[in-house]
Amino acid sequence: ALSYKSGDGFLLQSAVKSNQSLCLLADNGRCYTLAMANLPSARGNGEPLSSMLSLEAGSKIIAACLWQEAGQYVVAADNGCGFIVSGADLFSKTKTGKALINTGEAKALSLQALDSDEDEILALNNAGRALILPARELPQLAKGKGNQIIGISKKQFAEGLRMNHIVLLPAQANVLLFAAKQKMRIRAEERGQY
């Protein structure tokens, strides 16, 4: 079992080898790249990311994934906007990172590796709505705001409506959603309805 300092806890994990790099996304839309060889070994107590990165005041890391130069990634914010970015455009050489997604008043939500052009995106909002769309419908940008993935107007955003989850689905995968004591299955052949 891992032990944490007071106020700390588990956030996420990512499978990355020591000769690879990790891409991190902060909630303010900035991305950072860390060489795994620079991280302390698992035998110690670790080291705060803030000692290796220059995070802006009040921002926090919300997503991490293996960085590959030839890879493609889906990045999204909780206002429902997102786009596809190439691995080359995601790479940051500096401790201060680079601006990736223009969030405005929103917060960055997700950074996930796209495995195939056939992958689909499942987007969920905090009102319980679900939408499935082909990932290839998103624009490929180096940075910016992107397109609307799930509809959230400025008025709805001001009232608290947010996209709170985004999941990349392989082409023929079934989906099982749970909410409290209810569950809903979406079979691959039924995805067109969503």
Range-by-range predicted roles:
Residues A1-Y194:
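Short, structured "edge-of-domain" segments at secondary-structure transitions
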